[in-house]
Amino acid sequence: VSSISTSTITIGAAGTGGAAVSGSAGSSGVAGGASSWADGTNTITGNGGAQGLSVWANYGNGGLGGTATGGDINIQGCIGGGGWTPKGGDSVLGFGGVWQNYENYATAVATGYGGGGVGGVNSAYSATYGVGRPGTAGIIIVWEYK
């Protein structure tokens, strides 16, 4: 690649965690946005992961990890975990949020870049419900050399 004078860089927005709702399945999260680089010749895209899905009776499903296209190396993000231990999917540069505490159904936020959000926790055995937490935004890293 030579003489790239301009490029368009888009940083994918963080997906949101689903709400916990007493007496129902709660709400599903929102998928993360795509991060991309486009310079007129090359387009490289890291798609955001899919949202986790809320279901009735405690067990939600983790969302699929994001995919990548156009790079020399394209690494897919990890799938999020569901069930009693929900966890947002990890990326190469970030970690997904996680269900943190059984007693009060707390959830911990995602860290780094591209970490998946964690879904809300709904328990049939407790009046306490944990609210989902958002994921983290994507990142574009540019190395210039001559």
Model-predicted segments: where are they?
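Low-complexity, glycine/proline-biased repetitive segments and flexible coils/loops
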Residues: 1-146
